[in-house]
């Protein structure tokens, strides 16, 4: 209960994540590893649980097995508390032989779960962002403003508006116009060069959400941003919640205020990982007041057998043998052999960097064996023939692409 209201959460975790390919070749975007031992989905789930929202349905679709397995291992709630659960929900085809047709349709196809739980409020959040947020503050705002729906929002540069739902509000914060990914947008009053963007996170009064979903479905509308919210903004009281006002305990002075990243591209994903690195990171993964939970790891501690290490994150079970590691993140059970160099790179679980190999500005997905002496990130033309290269030049080696 929050402010006397019962709350049910739907997490939309069915995204295909095509712009994150090849990291999403065998997994969905929310299941992509992040930092030392997390998955992207862990951020929204941690925000919900830390906000005392314990009734959570995780809506999955594309390449969901990795996400299902992670949820089963990392997000087990007490069976003694019936309203404490993180339950994975694949498409049930309740209304015919169709997968989820859009974000709103994923919730529409599961309205029976709303009727089962009978909450006062329903929160609908995405699963592919890196941030901390106390949802209780947004819910209290929703109640205080007597909103039918509330959209979490923050300013974005005008050149990025085509990637977001763009909001226009009146002086009281009520949404008067909602356009999904427009080619251009007007600047915010008092913020030249910026527009107010939806974060894809919503709070709804339950009865009104059910009614709005049924209306949208009857008109062939399947998406929150394209269909449901623009229609609700015309009929109902829909408010914008300013994410920058969300207060979080434990944030250090050097961290970026109201940190939030959409990690939907390789470059955005790469940059967000490195935002967590260093003595004064923009986003510190460690905050005892608001932990980001992860799969409990029983692996042995990392081992370093000589070498040069500077500004690095080493996961459990990492072994480094007389190697050079600079400004890099190494996840569980990575092995870096003698004479190898890893610089400005992300090396994922159980990959091996062979003797004398050199890796620079790259993402090496799980279960790869970089052969002795191989160079990755030093010759763009040679790398492009074998691997994926992002717009900014980050080399991505797909899961298990390099075999022993």
Swiss-Prot record:
Pfam families: Hexapep_GlmU, NTP_transferase. GO terms for biological process: glycogen biosynthetic process. Signal peptide: none annotated. Its EC number is 2.7.7.27. Pathway: Glycan biosynthesis; glycogen biosynthesis. Alpha-D-glucose 1-phosphate binds at residues 165, 180-181, 198. It is an enzyme of class 2 (transferase). Homotetramer. NCBIfam families: PRK00844.1. This is Glucose-1-phosphate adenylyltransferase. It comes from Aromatoleum aromaticum (strain DSM 19018 / LMG 30748 / EbN1).
